[in-house]
Structure formats: structure tokens, C-alpha cells
Amino acid sequence: MKIVVTGAAGFIGSNLVKGLNARGIDDIIAVDDLTQGDKFRNLADLRIADYMDAGDFYDRFAEGAFGHVEAVFHEGACSDTMEPDGKYMMANNYTLSCNLFRACQNQNTRLLYASSAATYGGSDTFSESPEFEKPLNVYGYSKLLFDQHMRRELGMRFENAQTQVAGFRYFNVYGPREQHKGRMASVAFHQFNQFQADGKVKLFGDYGGYGPGGQMRDFVFIDDVVAVNLWFFDHPEKSGIFNLGTGRAQPFNDVAIAVVNTLRQSQNAAPLSLEDAVRGGMIDYVGFPEALVGKYQSYTQADLGALRAAGCQHVFADVQSGVTAYMQWLSNAKN
């Protein structure tokens, strides 16, 4: 069974390869752009059949150069929500995805692709329906445009799909193998490094009607993202657009105190309440950056109705358990 993973050296892509390997699947073509060379580390401990540069792959795949491919996990994209170059964003996230979809349809290959919660943008309702889709940046728009293209081709719920097409609106994903992402890495990753360097972590202060560190997101652990992708891989009859979050909004303060207490525990120090951590100078609230005003989601919470209706009953980790596991992984990786 041949599988393609695009963005395979990236955060979610490499974890998908890891998840497939855990099932004994290694006939995997890993597709990426290794201009940022240190991303190779995400593939170094994994088993793949071949690697191909993204610049070469898409045309060759469309020509049928790889024989029958069972499924493409399409994670390759520009995921920088602050990227200002709209032409670059649309070429990478929209046009390329449209071409890949056509090639998959022509070859009877299943397509499981990364959409994004950024498609909702300024909405206060996070349900897979057009009236709630209000992107705040060109990244979110590029993802929404491809979802809209799929709806035109396959029907609103992809009910006309002859071969599986499933899009996943990832919420705030965090976990191992994101170290290459720079400013786009999760808050938990940055706070790990901040605490190691300075003994404190940083959060935004008041913004959007929320108090310091009170902005709320649906934080989802990478292992859960992989598990849901693989559930759909196991259920080829299921197509559509699905939110992939926990269904729980939690404040950034929850992430911060989980980081602080897990790292304190590794130093044999007692856990602290949020108030005590703030009082002790371990959580530092900073002014909200002007560049993000009007482009920032202060609240997200996935509506899991469509996911559950499809039959996926996966139980998601909360911030406390997921961030704790991640901090332990980062500590072990550093040592």
C-alpha cells in the first residue's frame, strides 16, 4: 500500500509518517522542500520508501509516475499566518491543492488534507458552515478558498465524492517535531524555551475583552491530530470537512501554568497556582503587538458535531495532560 505525505518533514506531516510507521506502514513517499535543511531531523528516525522535492513531485504525480497510490495526506502548505505575500500564499495553498485534487481524482487516490481553523477568523461560532467562515488573514482565506472549491466539486458535505476526500480544520496544534517552525511554533514550545532560559514565560496581556492570558483557544495535542487522520484513513467511506480540535476552549494561562509546573517538577519544586506563579514573576504579561490587532483570534472552540456524526469518537487530551506530556518530551529531547 503506497502512501504519499506532503509536508512530510514538517510538524504534522512527520507525525503522520510516525503514526503510519507505528502501524507497520513504510511504503511512504515523503514530499517536502528542505530549503530549511534542519527539518531533516523530523524524518531521520522514521521509515520511508522515498523522498521527493515538492518542486518535482506534483507534476510527476499528475502524470501517474508512482503507480497506484492509495492515499495522499496533504499537509504541505505555507502555514505562516503572518505571511504578507498573498500571491505566494495562494499559489502554495490553493492552486497547488486544486491541481493535487484533480490528480487524485484521476487516479482513484484518496485525499486527506489540512484545512485550518483560520477559516473561521473573526467568527464566534466554529461550525463547518459558510456563514461562520470569516478569515482574518490571507492564510485563512487560502485555506477557505480550497474548501469552497471542494464544495463546488463534491457538494456541500462532499456527498458526491467517488473517492474519499476529507479536510481537517486544525485548531491550535502543539507537540513534538515543531521545533523548526520559528515564530509559528506553539505557545507551549516557546514557553518551554523561555522558562529554560529565564525562569519565566510570556503571555499577552489584556486584549479583545479578555484579561491577561485569558484569551482562549482550542489547543489540540499532535497525537490526537494523528489519531483522527488515521481514523479517517481506516474509514474510506467518510468524506467532508471536519473540525479537528478538542471541543474545549482553554485560556493561554492554562498552557502557561502547565509549562511552569511540569518544568518545576523536573527540578523537584512544588506545583504553584496561577496566582502564585504570577506573583512569583514566573508568568510575565506583555503588551499586545500592534501588528496583530484585528488579525487575531481571541477565542476558538471546535464544534465536533460533524466529527462525531461521522462516527469518530476519539477522546482528546486536555491542556493539562497534553502540555505535561509535551514538556516531558522536550526535556528528554534536550537531554
UniProtKB/Swiss-Prot annotation:
Pathway as given in its UniProt record: Nucleotide-sugar biosynthesis; ADP-L-glycero-beta-D-manno-heptose biosynthesis; ADP-L-glycero-beta-D-manno-heptose from D-glycero-beta-D-manno-heptose 7-phosphate: step 4/4
UniProt keyword list: Carbohydrate metabolism, Isomerase, NADP
Binding-site residues, substrate: 172, 183, 190, 204-207, 217, 296
Cofactor(s) needed: NADP(+)
Domain of life: Bacteria
Active site annotation, chain numbering: 139, 181
Record bears the keyword DNA damage: no
Binding site for NADP(+): 11-12, 32-33, 39, 75-79, 92, 143, 173, 181
Reactions catalysed, as given in the entry: ADP-D-glycero-beta-D-manno-heptose = ADP-L-glycero-beta-D-manno-heptose
Known EC number: 5.1.3.20
Record text on cofactor binding: Binds 1 NADP(+) per subunit.
EC primary class: isomerase
Classification via InterPro entries: Epimerase_deHydtase (IPR001509), Heptose_epim (IPR011912), NAD(P)-bd_dom_sf (IPR036291)
MF GO annotations: ADP-glyceromanno-heptose 6-epimerase activity; NADP binding
Quaternary structure and partners: Homopentamer.
Family the UniProt entry places it in: Belongs to the NAD(P)-dependent epimerase/dehydratase family. HldD subfamily.
Role noted for this protein: Catalyzes the interconversion between ADP-D-glycero-beta-D-manno-heptose and ADP-L-glycero-beta-D-manno-heptose via an epimerization at carbon 6 of the heptose.
Domain notes: Contains a large N-terminal NADP-binding domain, and a smaller C-terminal substrate-binding domain.
HAMAP family per record: Heptose_epimerase
Protein name: ADP-L-glycero-D-manno-heptose-6-epimerase
Name of the gene this protein is made from: hldD
